[in-house]
Swiss-Prot record:
Biological processes per GO annotation: glutamate biosynthetic process; glutamine catabolic process
Disulfide bonds: none
Gene this protein is translated from: glsA
Name of protein: Glutaminase
Source taxon at top rank: Bacteria
Organism, scientific name: Hahella chejuensis (strain KCTC 2396)
Residues binding substrate, per UniProt: 68, 118, 162, 169, 193, 244, 262
InterPro entries in the cross-refs: Beta-lactam/transpept-like, Glutaminase
Quaternary structure note: Homotetramer.
UniProt-listed Enzyme Commission number(s): 3.5.1.2
SUPFAM superfamilies tied to this protein: beta-lactamase/transpeptidase-like (SSF56601)
Keywords for this protein: Hydrolase
Family the UniProt entry places it in: Belongs to the glutaminase family.
GO molecular function: glutaminase activity
Amino acid sequence: MKLQKSELPALLERIYSEVTPLYGVGKTADYIPPLSRVNPRQFGMAIRFVDGDEFTVGQASTPFSIQSISKLFALMLALDIVGDDLWKRVGREPSGMRFNSLLQLENENGIPRNPFINAGAIVVTDTIVNHSASPVKRLEQFMASLSGNVFNRYDPEVYVAEARTGYRNAAIANLLKALGNLEGEVDVVLDSYYKQCSMTMSCLDLARATESLANKGKSSFRTQFHGERMDKRVNALMLTCGLYDAAGNFAYQVGLPAKSGVGGGIVAVLPGYFSVAVWSPELDSYGNSVLGQKALELLTHYTSSSIF
């Protein structure tokens, strides 16, 4: 990485000044009412190095709805619980179709392509539900153990909106059940899934929570962690499947494993160096933050950092 840490504060300010003119290019997620009401003119960014040094700019400490970024933490927890047995129920390939496709799920006998599309994430949540007395609390505690912030919780208003508008997710869960790949009760699994997607965290929380993915599974906040080289496996899935239908273009433009959510957040890691989280609510047509993607592209450009 061609940059001294002492130069990072100035670089982050430069990135901030270069991305904020993009306000208005995208739009907030209008199909989840609480997200549509978020002030769109916000941007935050936080970087955490594997030695614990942190740098931030903008609204890096502002909590927001992490949405599909929660699928990353649910995956890590499910793998912590059942290990490679999870892959008997969900694949590890890009889908090539919409993240909430029913057609692909039925054509492939109820085995979702990967854990980041909705069908795969629901199977992951089902795994947690079937191994936990209180699955939502267990996930909250797991995420708190990664971020060091015990106040990360789901947002009740967002949860209610998710549940009221989640018709397609209900269809996916029922199809999974019909095809024999949902062990729990549909309503119970969906309730946990909606609460999971409604979790709130800040950029700083997310950068800390993904530190282990940049540091060979080692976390500053958690003494025991997931299995051998979990970071390698999860990072591979983020690179190929982490940004909906734009994963290939993001790998080309940015060159880091990453996971996004329609709340406007993106987490990314440069293994051996740092984890980074960005947030800005306005999305492109693929559901990814316009300013967030540009900020990460500028970061890797100015620091000559990439996994490639």
